[in-house]
């Protein structure tokens, strides 16, 4: 009889339960669950029980578990402040006078590193506009349900999207603008990648432009200068799953890390003229390229303003 080499067989031989089995029964810690969802192919590999301890040590698994346990029961702003204190980012701000003192606006930053970008923006806004709401991955609520008082959740998992979740996102969005809050939205929705020696922002979605038009609020562009580790960019070239498994490593390795945020001049919704895709491309270029070179740059509309 041939020896089977399925993941469950290897796991039984090693005296441990299959990672996939634990995920199905809900026996995984939330950090394990999030890692499993980002490594579906790897976690089914026959050698996964052997690879897992090594990878988890590299990716700072135990630190991530302690962090998640610490914020699990906290209200959103307290949880974010915990993360802020944990990282103690070395933050340099420019153009903070461009942040409206009251009333809704959309802060539209580039997205160089991941979760740490959100912490940096929180640090930048918490004294200027503590009434902020931040669009973020719905997974944040799975780690700390209290984030609902700070985060507008967006579901990224195709198989988990639903009309109910979409309605929830839309309702929380309307509430944030109705309350006159500062709304943070990373238009790329994905982390920048390394391309021929340059950190490259992924194409922006038109959400920020659409929301600014709908709610008639200005957009404040924000250029973030920061980067991830060489390990992240190396793995990104070879395995998207290994890259995605570094999500907590690339947060926790930012302790005392330098971030620079340049806030550009507010762009009135009336200047967002043209096809949404064209306006969005112009906004991305303005934020990622022009603000980096000239903090006083004025947004140039994609179409002539009548």
Q: Residues of each region from the PLM?
A:
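Short, flexible loop segments at the rims of nucleotide/cofactor-binding pockets, characterized by
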Residues: 82-88, 111, 159-164, 197-198
